[in-house]
Amino acid sequence: MDEELYSRQLYVLGLPAMQRIQEAKVLLCGLQGLGAEVAKNLVLTGVGSLTLHDPHPTCWADLAAQCFLSEESLGRNRAEASQAQLAQLNEAVQISVHSGDITEDLLQGFQVVVLTDSKLEDQLKVGPLCHKHGVRFLMAETRGLVGRLFCDFGEDFTVLDPTEVEPMTAAIQDISQGFPGIVTLRGDTKRHSFHDGDLVIFSDIEGMVELNSCSPQSVRVQKDGSLEIGDTTTFSRYLRGGVVTEVKRPKTVRHKPLDIALLQPHVVAQNTQEVQRAHCLHQAFHVLHKFQQLHGRLPKPWDPDDAETVVELAQDLEPLKGTEEESLDEALLRTIALSSAGTLSPMAAIMGGVAAQEVLKAISRKFMPLDQWLYFDALECLPEDETLLPSPEDCQPRNCRYDGQIAVFGTDLQEKLSDQHYLLVGAGAIGCEMLKVFALVGLGVRANGGVTVADMDYIERSNLSRQFLFRPKDVRRPKAEVAAAAAHRLNPDLRATPYTCPLDPTTEDIYDDSFFSRVNGVVAALDSFQARHYVAARCTHYLKPLLEAGTQGTWGSASVFVPYVTEAYRGPASDAASEDAPYPVCTLRHIPSSMEHSVQWAQDQFEGLFRLSTETINCYQQTCTSLSATDRTETLALLQQVMGVLRTRPQTWQDCVVWALGHWQLCFHDKVLEGGTQFSSGSNKCPHPLQFDPNHDMHFLYVLAAANLYARMHGLPGSQSQPALRELLTRLLESDSRPQNLFSAEHGQEQLKELQETLDDWRKGPPLKPVLFVKDDDSNFHVDFVVAATDLRCQNYGILPVNHARIKQIVGRIIPAIATSTAVVAGLLGLELYKVVSGLRSHGTFRHSYLHLAENHFIRSAPSAPAVQSFRDLKWTCWDRLKVPAVQPERTLKSLLAHLQEEHGLKVEMLLHHQALLYSSGWSSEKQAQHLCLRVTELVQHVTGWKPKPGLKVLVFELSCEGEEEEMAFPPLHYEL
């Protein structure tokens, strides 16, 4: 298992599921856009082998949604033309092409068979055969703006891990001896999520140790939150500690074969209205297949005669079982028929992402599969005004790469897409998928258009399992540059420009008024809430549409914000603040009660020892020459933070090991009972010191990692030889060569003199090398140090530690990720892109989307219209602003305030610029007079020290006015220069 490559999806699937995936054999039939999306996601995820089958040659319409085909592929077999590029995504996956017939014997050689965009007769042939032989079967297809997916995993399919949620755990406060036994949980975990009937196991209990080896116990939850278990009468008396952990129950799924499920469809839907629409879509697909059987083709694009034929065929269909009272929606059916010949990249991405996730469920037995039909439509992308719908002539093939898209929307939208200029912020997983969408739909391919790709990050190997535009040779190269070049290869007409500087307050001279004046819209593909909020604020300021998406594991969301049409982006209020919220220092230093506390403490140790200490010492040596009694308090307070490294400069690897061993002793023995006071408060156990044991894995790992990091900091060669280190540790322990603390608590003259001598010695050598934490290099000992320090800290305080991967996730703030959900949210944004570029102006047309692929939840809802606020005769929304035109000579603050009162009836009480107070009616008359006479730009410079940069067109102010209500927020004041 290449854990570095698959690290992000291992947090989603787990190691056992990934091992099953790597051993699986999958047959994929159909390599149009939808099939290519399924293939891409499976190869990125790392299936064992993928066999491609498609007997058809590449045509122009395929290029609208198939990113592995090009104009050079025209006339070539689709599977053969796609094979080489798919193989580049993951060299560990065996990819082959089957060019013969699909026979019963062939099917039995695979765990999963997938048909995409296939004929009904092929579906009815392959589906029942797979059911007969226990081969999991999936069928997916798209027709224009509608799509469907069918799953048949057999009559007795066991799901080993039904949910994405980690098993619940809780710390134990007490366990009674009795029948039943009562498990009291610690005070901070009473509000748990255990339910009656849950199975649990126990671990790390002292005293009542019999429970540690018991089989899973069923619990009943009491009113006070305690758990009732079986008979504990004969067990030993409970003393302390312990953790109760949920055991997930496997679930069995029973699926019908396709031939039966077609007549008795069970659809995934969130409400009755969705069920009825899904039944209509089910009938629509059925009649489209019937039309295709009769005419050898799908209905012609926007041909009214063909659409009427489809409606007539539907009237002859037998009602679905259980739907006899549902009437056929002829208008919906007619619209589906008119656009069914088209092929769209966003639809392929959505259905391909969901289908690939179902394949992974079939292989890994992790997460609940669909039961059994999923229908999806985005017909709201079409104009509501029938006079604006495309004509048959406008949708005729033009032998170009956009023919599949023109068949749905006509040439008008294609022309608009070509002239768009979009800013893509973030070239990670979602960013790569969005560049694919841009390339396939033809966005920014003419001289007036383009795509600016902004990302300051560099490619890491762990990116390659999701960010499909990158290859192993691209590791350590800028994401923006590589992604822009790769997108150009997908569509040579795409005008993609990379920017490797961040989009944040420090670069507003780059992403300035002139830059945003050229941009038609923004796509935010960011994993930082703080960055999302900033980008959204820029879009609101410049009145640009914002398409925004994010994922975490199999969760995903996609949202759209259009000026004056929808609400503006706000996001949860706590998002940005919670990203960097630390634990209380007192908790980290003295009374950790959870593994998370220990992880944070270990990370602080890393930063303090190997980065901050070196920076502090280097800075001090460059700026200070002596320590005097007058400045010793401040100076020593600073240097006290780095006392752990203020020793004789190491000269050899052994010196580094001696230091690491001494620091182990200091942290996990000497300081644990500092002052000789043991305690146990609330949920905290009495701490106990550790005795160093070179044969203990974590003791040894700590010294190995710390010594190597210390050596690197001093520019010395380290060592990865574990046998040699064990031998060295044995000698050191026998000779008791561990160092003593260099400094005492008192900082008198002797201490100052000793410290001065140490610093003088260090100044003679080269500066230290700060070690910056890098989470994705398993050979650099960074994560090893934090893992070992966390584990040892947990041992000190009786906290049950967790595995290496979980600690790495916490310390690296790693977001679980998988290719499937990324593809889906990008496809959803692609649909909203159609609407924005089309110029649709009804907020009810747009969609915010939320999905959870693990549990088959798909929710799409219309965004709210922007809320209207009013003050006297003034009305505004979040998209409005008070504009003050430029005049010569420039206005003074006094004339600006007079203008606002005369034009808008606003008597300003406070005026702010970037939180700097420029004016307050509560000031003294003298201070007001000083400010009122200044010109506005002079005032800003006087108060903030900031001088407006050349080219700046607008200054933005916030204001508070007389008579405003408490919850009122006036629109920003845009002062034109």
From Swiss-Prot:
Metabolic or biological pathway, per its Swiss-Prot or TrEMBL entry: Protein modification; protein ubiquitination
InterPro entries from the UniProt entry: E1_4HB, E1_FCCH, E1_FCCH_sf, ThiF/MoeB/HesA, ThiF_NAD_FAD-bd, Ub-activating_enz_E1_C, Ub-E1_IAD_1, UBA_E1_C_sf
GO molecular function: ISG15 activating enzyme activity; ubiquitin activating enzyme activity
Keyword Isomerase applies: no
Major site of localization recorded for this protein: cytoplasm
Pfam families, per the entry: E1_4HB, E1_FCCH, E1_UFD, ThiF, UBA_E1_SCCH
Class in the EC hierarchy, top level: ligase
Enzyme Commission number(s) of this protein: 6.2.1.-
Top-rank taxon, per record: Eukaryota
Sorted UniProt keywords: Cytoplasm, Ligase, Nucleus, Ubl conjugation
Gene Ontology CC terms: cytoplasm; nucleus
GO BP, one annotated term: modification-dependent protein catabolic process
Family: Belongs to the ubiquitin-activating E1 family.
The protein's name in its UniProt record: Ubiquitin-like modifier-activating enzyme 7
